Structure formats: structure tokens, C-alpha cells
Curated annotation (Swiss-Prot):
The gene is mutL. The keyword DNA repair applies. Gene3D superfamilies: 3.30.230.10, Histidine kinase-like ATPase, C-terminal domain, MutL, C-terminal domain, dimerisation subdomain, MutL, C-terminal domain, regulatory subdomain. One of its GO terms (cellular component) is mismatch repair complex. This protein is involved in the repair of mismatches in DNA. It is required for dam-dependent methyl-directed DNA mismatch repair. May act as a 'molecular matchmaker', a protein that promotes the formation of a stable complex between two or more DNA-binding proteins in an ATP-dependent manner without itself being part of a final effector complex. One of its GO terms (biological process) is mismatch repair. It comes from Pelotomaculum thermopropionicum (strain DSM 13744 / JCM 10971 / SI). Keywords: DNA damage, DNA repair. This is DNA mismatch repair protein MutL. HAMAP family: DNA_mis_repair. InterPro entries: DNA_mismatch_repair_CS (IPR014762), DNA_mismatch_repair_MutL (IPR020667), DNA_mismatch_S5_2-like (IPR013507), HATPase_C_sf (IPR036890), MutL/Mlh/PMS (IPR002099), MutL/Mlh/Pms-like (IPR038973), MutL_C (IPR014790), MutL_C_dimsub (IPR042120).
Length: 605
């Protein structure tokens, strides 16, 4: 008897589904791309339970006949290609004929569809890949597909899913990218009957960009349009002031397909050069058009990764065009990018509302009085702040805090820094200090960063906040808004007072007292990027440490700021009291020591 057997259709279907359908966002991608290929001008997506309970996609495309509907759920059945030669010039988003049967293999599906010239439509039901019912139905032209109980017959895969809110955020993020790729199509996303995303389908990319990222970001984008050597480029580059800590806001579209292409993303970053600080990434939406023969999309069932056959040439050409575009435009941020006044309120506003989840309720802060205590200023008063015995004594208390479960530890104690005396400032970056055992060179920014970081951690998770005289409006994309709603308590514990303003808009009313003016929006966006990089592995303690490091970096005295001798000595004294004085929170060295013995050897004594 042969050991090798041909698998039954059900088992083969589940294996194929494992490649194509990784999670709800995979289903959304395949269904929406089918709607796009069908010529839809409007696509509506409804989600329940993050897509695990139900995903509905409604479009006004060409629809299917009864015969095509049945064939569409057969493996390797497609209307997109006819022969192998067509694989060399694919112009549609789908072509493999695997998506619908793979989705049907791990879910329960209901489909209603009608072509424009038909008097009636067709309704069909599938479960576990099997057709269980079919008949006529009255419905508008187009197709409506509802996928229920995703992974109901693969419990191991279902258990591996994230929380519904996280899965829903992934779905919303993908639809946002598709809206950028196809600005001529109107996209809508609804959750429990409430519309959470809408793009107008005007055909203008800037309108879709405003729908995804908000009008504030759209207003700071630089238009790029060029044609060179068979490459057509159309899109927008964000000014350096919009930079992020991850590539989450780089959207690459090739031949109308949203893709991940590291070479193109690197070319976009390379075009900015020194316009961006180290570790920062631009905001960019670029649509490239190349000959279909130069684009291989048949390298993965999900069709998200592609291969450009002249990748190096295309990336080099693109980088040059983008450099020219950035050089031609003013990239200095306008005054409108920064919050006007940027003043803190010492009196606590009664009844400030902090949104803490979708329908989960509103947390109201208790009323508070006013205080006449001094609040330290921003960078211009940095020398005064450095000499204060305890900066916490001069800041109004938080109006509302949660009890800290524990105080985050920031590492085992190491050898203490000896007593140092400041000798000179050279250049206004490093402090030259003398100790009993040699000469010390101290990075003033890294040292102050370490001090602030440990002060934040030592206070636990109940951070004091300062209210802003003028709240900062945050226009987020759907993914960011979902993260903020889900993790709002974490932000509150870190010292941020945030109010949901409706849709994907929030008001930042208060910030940790250490944060200098003008950094409010950027720190929130960086903290949201943290969750994208960590995913489900983000714990509250790790988030608090990361937030403390980010706040400390933005609050510390900068390289190039001149300090008086008393201020330098105060900084050194505070540094010696830290648990880890030799590195900053990001791991960079704070102190370099030249012992007397090393100096004697250098001078050959």
C-alpha cells in the first residue's frame, strides 16, 4: 500500500486557507480587492468582534451571475487570467483563484449578488467550504458578502487571534491604505452600525489623505508628480516636522496595489537625508506606475509582498526625484504646526472628561481649586530647573490618578558615580569634570535624560499633569484612534489628559509636567507607534518605561545649550544620585573617564 495519499478536498482547503487567511484583516483584504476588481465605486465594510464574529463587504460593482457565483468558490477558478502568459502582465489585484474558497473553508459565508442587466440576483450560503443553499433574491446590482464565525472549525488559529479591538484596528488600517491606493472609490467602515471611517471617493489623493490622516497632516504634505524612464510617480511627501518613529506612515502603491516594498521605502527615507533626525521616519504616500512586466506579484498568496524586476534602478531613480521635490519646497515647519501660547494651567479644570473605551464609559476628574505655586518654565529656564532641590515641589498635583500596582524597576544598582566638580564646558555639549581618580567627560543631554527618566520611574504610575491653556487637537487615523481608545488608561497613568472629541479626533488637555511646550503632539504619536512595533507583546510596565524614556529625551537639556558652572555642578550632583549614571535610557554612554594613570601614559610621565 502506498504511503503517499492525495488529501481530501476539505483538508487541502484548510491547508490553503492557512496561507491565505491568517486573520480577519486577510479576509477584508481579499474581499475588498475583489470589489475593486469588480469596478466598484463604493465599498462598505462592517465589522463585528474585530472581524472574528462577522465581516460584511458591500459593493456596487459588476456583480456575478448564478453560474459565476458557484464557480467563484471553486479552487483556482478566476476571471482575472486565462493562461500562464497573463501572469507576466497582471493588471488586477486578484488572479490566483484561491481567496474565496480559502475563506469559505474556515468560515460560514452568505453571498447576495446581481449583475446590472439581471432582473433578480442570486443568494448562496457556504459552510466549511461546502455549498449548503442557493436561490434567487431581490437585491441591487453589485455583491454583498458576509463572513461569519471565522476559524470556527480551526480552534487553534482562533485562539491565536488578538483582542477584537486589535484585530479591528488592523482591518481599519488596511482599508485606510486601500483608500489611499484608490482615491476614486468611496470607502466606508462601520462597527456596530457606527461609521468610523469614510473616504469621499473624489478621485483626488489629497482628499483621501485628509480622510485617513486628518486635515492637519494633509495641509503639511508636499505634492510630487513626475515621469521618468518608464516610471510614473504621483503622491505626497510629509514635511520633516511630521516624522514618526516607525515606517507606519509610509504607504507605497505600485500599479494601484498597496504593497510592502522595503527597497522603495528605503529610497523614500534616503531622499530625506539629513532633513530627518536619526531614528525618524517620514510620512509619505506614493503611487508608482511601472510596466506590468516589471512587477512580479506572484510571490506570496497574500499578494502583499511584490518584487520589482529592476528594483535597484527604480529605487535610485525614485530617490533622485524625491530629493529634488524636497529641495524645491519649503520644509521648514510653519508656525501653525506648533501650539500657540503653549501655556500650562495650574488650576485643575473640574469635570474634565477622559474617554476610556468604545462605550465603556466616561471617567470624570473631581473638581479642584487653584494654586499659586510656581511651575518651572520650559528650556529657557533650564539652568534654574537644574539647581532646584526638588522639581516636584513646584508642580500642581494630578487631579485624578489610579493607584499604582507596583513601582517599575529600572535595573539593578551599579557602581555610584564619584563626586565630580565641573571644570569647563567644551563645546556646549560636554561637561569636563574633575574627580578624585581622573578626568570625566559628561554628555549633558544624556546625563539630564537619565536623571529625568529615573525621577519619572521612581514616582510610579501616578504621574502629575499640567493642563494646557490651549488644548492640542489630535487627528488620528483609524488604527491610531483604536489603539488610543483601548489604552487610554495607560496614557492617563503616564500623565496625559485626553478627551475623545468624536470620530478619530481627540483633545489633549494635559501632559506630564516634564514635557516642554511644542512636544505634545509628537510624543503622543511616538507612543502610538510604540504599540505598532510591539503588538500584543506591549505590557503596561514596558510602556511606562518607554514613555518615561521618550519624555526624558524630549525634556532634557539639548546639546549646544550653554550651562553656567553652578548648573553643571547641579547636574553632576543629581546624576550621581541615579541608579544607573553611566548610560542614558536608550543605552548611549553618559560618561567617559580618563584616569590619572591614562593621562600620565599619554604624557609619557
Amino acid at each position: 500500500m502506498a504511503n503517499i495519499i492525495i488529501l481530501d478536498e476539505f483538508t487541502a482547503g484548510q491547508i490553503a486557507a492557512g496561507e491565505v487567511v491568517e486573520r480577519p484583516v486577510s479576509v477584508v483584504k481579499e474581499l475588498v480587492e475583489n470589489s475593486i476588481d469588480a469596478g466598484a465605486g463604493r465599498i462598505v465594510v462592517e465589522l463585528e468582534g474585530g472581524g472574528l464574529q462577522a465581516i460584511s463587504v458591500l459593493d456596487d460593482g459588476c456583480g456575478m451571475s448564478e453560474e459565476d457565483l458557484v464557480l467563484a468558490f471553486q479552487r483556482h477558478a478566476t476571471s482575472k487570467i486565462k493562461c500562464s502568459d497573463d501572469l507576466n502582465r497582471i493588471t488586477t489585484l486578484g488572479f490566483r483563484g484561491e481567496a474565496l474558497p480559502s475563506i469559505a473553508a474556515v468560515s460560514k459565508i452568505t453571498v447576495a449578488t446581481r449583475t446590472r442587466d439581471a432582473l433578480a440576483g442570486t443568494r448562496a450560503e457556504f459552510a466549511g467550504g461546502e455549498l449548503i443553499g442557493k436561490g434567487p433574491i431581490g437585491c441591487p446590482p453589485g455583491t454583498s458578502i458576509t463572513v461569519r464565525d471565522l476559524f470556527y472549525n480551526t480552534p487553534a488559529r482562533r485562539k491565536a487571534m488578538k483582542a477584537p479591538s486589535a484585530e479591528g484596528a488592523l482591518c481599519g488600517g488596511l482599508i485606510s491604505r486601500l483608500a489611499l491606493a484608490r482615491p476614486e472609490i468611496c470607502f466606508e467602515v462601520g462597527i456596530k452600525g457606527r461609521r468610523v471611517f469614510y473616504s469621499p471617493g473624489s478621485g483626488n489623493l489629497i482628499d483621501s489623505l485628509a480622510a485617513v490622516y486628518g486635515r492637519q497632516i494633509a495641509a503639511e504634505m508636499i505634492a510630487v508628480k513626475a515621469v521618468a524612464e518608464g516610471l510614473s510617480i504621483n503622491g505626497y511627501l510629509g514635511k520633516p516636522s511630521l516624522s514618526r518613529s516607525t515606517r507606519s506612515h509610509i504607504t507605497v502603491i505600485i500599479n494601484g496595489r498597496y504593497v510592502r516594498c522595503p527597497a522603495i521605502a528605503e529610497a523614500i527615507e534616503g531622499a530625506y537625508g539629513t532633513l530627518l533626525s536619526r531614528g525618524r521616519r517620514p510620512v509619505a504616500v506614493l503611487s508608482l506606475s511601472v510596466s506590468p512586466e516589471l512587477l512580479d506579484v506572484n510571490i506570496h498568496p497574500a499578494k502583499l509582498e511584490v518584487r520589482l524586476l529592476e528594483e535597484e534602478k527604480t529605487a535610485s531613480l525614485l530617490a533622485g526625484i524625491l530629493k529634488d521635490a524636497l529641495a524645491d519646497k519649503a520644509v521648514i515647519p510653519s508656525a501653525g504646526n506648533f501650539r500657540q501660547a503653549a501655556l500650562r494651567l495650574e488650576n485643575n479644570k473640574p469635570g474634565a472628561e477622559i474617554f476610556d473605551g468604545l462605550g465603556a464609559g466616561i471617567i470624570k476628574t473631581p473638581g479642584g481649586g487653584s494654586s499659586d505655586r510656581h511651575v518651572p518654565g520650559d528650556k529657557k529656564n533650564i539652568q534654574e530647573c537644574l539647581t532646584l532641590p526638588d522639581a516636584h515641589e513646584y508642580v500642581a498635583d494630578r487631579v485624578w490618578v489610579r493607584e499604582a500596582e507596583d513601582t517599575p524597576a529600572y535595573g539593578n544598582k551599579v557602581e555610584k558615580l564619584p563626586v565630580l566638580n565641573a571644570l569647563a564646558h567644551f563645546p556646549p555639549v560636554y561637561i569636563l569634570a574633575g574627580g578624585e581618580d581622573g578626568l570625566y567627560i559628561v554628555d549633558q543631554h544624556a546625563a539630564h535624560e537619565r536623571i529625568i527618566y529615573e525621577e519619572i520611574l521612581s514616582s510610579g504610575r501616578t504621574r502629575p499633569s499640567q493642563y494646557l491653556l490651549v488644548p492640542v487637537m489630535l487627528e488620528l487615523d483609524y488604527r491610531e484612534a483604536s489603539i488610543l481608545i483601548e489604552r487610554i488608561i495607560w496614557f492617563t497613568d503616564a500623565g496625559f489628559v485626553i478627551e475623545h472629541f468624536g470620530g478619530n479626533t481627540f483633545l489633549l488637555r494635559g501632559v506630564p509636567f516634564e514635557l516642554p511646550a511644542g512636544q505634545e503632539r509628537e510624543i503622543i504619536l511616538d507612543l502610538l507607534d510604540y504599540f505598532e512595533s510591539k503588538g500584543t507583546g506591549a505590557g503596561m510596565t514596558d510602556f511606562f518605561k518607554w514613555a518615561a524614556a521618550s519624555i526624558a529625551c524630549r525634556s532634557a537639556v539639548r546639546a549646544g545649550e550653554k550651562l553656567s558652572l553652578p548648573s553643571m555642578n547641579a547636574l553632576l550632583q543629581r546624576l550621581s544620585g541615579t541608579a544607573s549614571p553611566y548610560t542614558c535610557p536608550h543605552g548611549r554612554p553618559v560618561v567617559i573617564k580618563l584616569s590619572f594613570r591614562e593621562l600620565e601614559l599619554r604624557f609619557r610621565r
